[in-house]
């Protein structure tokens, strides 16, 4: 079953497939694995692929897309491709060149969605994670509302169909929404969201503004050592989740994804394994009862696997707010 058959409508009229394929890879995984995984994902039915400049795999994703278009597996118009503007390119004059660089790597004329990766600007230069001699991130003072105007221009230029944000709290979203001369609202806010961080208040806020919540880390992240505390709880081993899974004769991963989808959230599922990719697409084949949903609501701990501590010293660091 293709992810394209199940879609959520964005506030600009475009449709986003209700399940996406995530493409982040840790340093120790070779880039060839990203190419292989993206090809497999397109073969098994994913039509929504989420990537980012910072993941350093846009070239591989582009190769996968082109090879599957040439092979007749997919048409460009059936795909929904997202990439992200990195924090070192928030200065207004850097936005369009950054998008054009991503498009070139992806071998695409346009992306379906372009989003600001974090609300926090970093110093531009040769390094994507610039630090000072003490190892602290080199942060910048750009107002993300100025950056947003350049995203609007990229949409008008036809380089992107929809524009959105990621990792914004409700106050930061409010600033964009209340910006004088706002031309386009963000269509989405992509945030960490899963059973241990169910983002209820942020979801309510976003729904009230017709902004879709897209979830990364939907299965409790892939627990990569680079970013995630290895002593943190393993979401998919949660006994309550496992009980609900057993009752529904489904895997814990499918239950975790279904929980998000039933709340109107668009989850991103990441895997390098074909059997997991196929299984995750079965999320549309069943429903959780109101009783199960209530049980799963009870797992929320407001626990964040990915606190983005490298940005913590900036006044726009988003996770100091409750939501």
Swiss-Prot record:
The record marks 84 as: Lowers pKa of active site Tyr. GO terms for biological process: xenobiotic metabolic process. Substrate binds at residue 117. SUPFAM superfamilies: NAD(P)-linked oxidoreductase (SSF51430). It comes from the Eukaryota. InterPro entries: AKR (IPR020471), AKR1C (IPR044482), Aldo/ket_reductase_CS (IPR018170), NADP_OxRdtase_dom (IPR023210), NADP_OxRdtase_dom_sf (IPR036812). Pfam families: Aldo_ket_red (PF00248). NAD(+) binds at residues 20-24, 50, 55, 166-167, 190, 216-224, 270-280. This is Aldo-keto reductase family 1 member C13. It comes from Mus musculus (Mouse). The gene is Akr1c13.
